[in-house]
Amino acid sequence: TEFATNDGGQR
């Protein structure tokens, strides 16, 4: 994802 999430997305 483009958003900083706790799922290991694209930060």
Curated annotation (Swiss-Prot):
* Function (record text): Degrades acharan sulfate and, to a lesser extent, heparin and heparan sulfate.
User: To which species is this protein native?
Assistant: Bacteroides stercoris
Please state what the protein is called: Acharan sulfate lyase 2
The protein's pH behavior is summarized as: Optimum pH is 7.2.
Name the EC number(s): 4.2.2.-
Chain segments annotated as coiled-coil in the UniProt record? none
Q: Does the keyword Lyase apply?
A: yes
* Modifications after synthesis and translation: The N-terminus is blocked.
How is this protein organized at the quaternary level?
Answer: Monomer.
Q: How does activity depend on temperature?
A: Optimum temperature 45 degrees Celsius.
Q: Which domain of life is it from?
A: Bacteria
